[in-house]
């Protein structure tokens, strides 16, 4: 059920800096995501609701409250590309993934309810790049990742399952379109997942099935997570075969994995190795668990949300070393409210 909210824009301080929004959730907020245009904000909470806000540089307003769909805490939300309409996916402790669409301004409806999609909590959800079609991946504590695919011909949804980590999967992220390039080949969808076995895993869709991407080799000899990997995020790509993935862990570590471009074989520029190595760089070791990592649109900045109530912003220098450039801490948050 959707509750349309009255239009009462709340002005915000015009001074440059963070904008604080009173979400009006009745319990802990677990995720907040901006849409493609940066004009809508979706939040989800342990109160089992999703709230949609219209936002601008100098005001925000609560547009709708989506409630009654999930039977447990809602962990994460994800916006689809606008070519598919105003579409939002949500995942919950109840093992389900729901797809919500704004059919009219301020009016939302569930267009697909994948209930009991998993046998345990669904911890992460993400839409694929629109070039692959309408696909949404979900990571679950039952150790599997599901990929929902919309069949436009008959308006139905199919599902593929990946058996990932037996201990559970906390997050999933898609490779951006253009992340990998091979002449005369259509780019295959790829995923990276965050597991409760302290590892990240890469997956590729080939010949009608999802398999482990054996072309990616991770160098874990010096830097690795020592506890659950809580989140993983594939950076936007500016050049093919120049990829970065950020992961964060319960142990407080944030690692940036950087692809080493495939080397030429025997000096032949048209022949490359069939695999690529990924080198890890420890961005920082926090004193508290790190829950979320998120890239800027260009992939130049990385936001990190940790258990110390701080959100920090990081940027890599020309030498490859990461440095903190900004922070939003609990003290400033309380002052802003």
Q: Which residue ranges define each predicted feature?
A:
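Beta-strand-rich domains and repeat architectures in extracellular enzymes and scaffolds
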Residues: 21-48
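Intrinsically disordered, low-complexity acidic/Ser/Thr/Pro-rich linker and tail segments
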Residues: 1-31, 261-273, 330-337
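Loop/turn segments within WD40 beta-propeller blades
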Residues: 32-38, 78-85, 126-133, 173-188, ...
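Short coil/turn segments within WD40 beta-propeller repeats
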Residues: 27-30, 47-51, 72-75, 93-98, ...
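Solenoidal tandem-repeat scaffolds enriched in leucines and small polar residues
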Residues: 112-209
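WD40/WD-repeat beta-propeller blade N-cap
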Residues: 21-29, 66-74, 114-122, 162-169, ...
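Short loop/turn segments immediately following beta-strands, especially the blade-tip
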Residues: 54-58, 101-107, 149-156, 203-212, ...
């Amino acid at each position: 059920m959707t509750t349309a909210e009255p239009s009462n824009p709340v002005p915000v301080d015009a001074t440059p800096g963070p904008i604080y929004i009173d979400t009006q959730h009745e319990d802990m907020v677990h995720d907040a995501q901006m849409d493609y245009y940066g004009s809508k904000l979706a939040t989800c909470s342990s109160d089992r609701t999703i709230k949609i806000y219209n936002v601008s540089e100098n005001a925000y307003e609560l547009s709708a409250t989506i409630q009654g769909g999930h039977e447990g805490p809602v962990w994460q939300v994800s916006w689809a590309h606008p070519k598919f309409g105003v579409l939002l996916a949500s995942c919950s402790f109840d093992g389900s993934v729901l797809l919500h669409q704004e059919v009219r301004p301020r009016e939302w409806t569930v267009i697909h309810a994948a209930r009991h999609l998993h046998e345990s909590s669904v911890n992460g959800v993400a839409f694929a790049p629109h070039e692959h079609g309408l696909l949404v991946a979900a990571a679950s504590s039952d150790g599997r990742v599901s990929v929902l695919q919309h069949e436009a011909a008959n308006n139905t949804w199919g599902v593929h399952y990946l058996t990932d980590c037996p201990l559970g999967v906390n997050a999933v992220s898609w490779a951006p379109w253009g992340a990998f390039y091979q002449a005369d080949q259509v780019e295959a969808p790829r995923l990276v997942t965050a597991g409760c076995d302290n590892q990240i895993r890469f997956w590729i869709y080939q010949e009608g099935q999802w398999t482990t991407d054996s072309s990616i080799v991770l160098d874990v000899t010096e830097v690795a997570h020592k506890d659950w990997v809580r989140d993983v995020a594939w950076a936007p790509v500016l050049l093919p075969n120049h990829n970065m993935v950020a992961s964060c862990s319960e142990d407080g570590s944030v690692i940036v994995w950087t692809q080493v471009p495939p080397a030429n074989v025997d000096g032949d520029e048209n022949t490359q190795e069939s695999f690529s190595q990924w080198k890890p760089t420890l961005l920082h070791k926090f004193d508290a668990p790190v829950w979320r990592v998120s890239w800027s649109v260009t992939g130049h900045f990385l936001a990190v949300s940790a258990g110390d109530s701080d959100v920090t912003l990081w940027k890599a220098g020309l030498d490859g070393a990461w440095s903190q450039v900004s922070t939003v801490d609990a003290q400033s948050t309380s002052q802003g409210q």
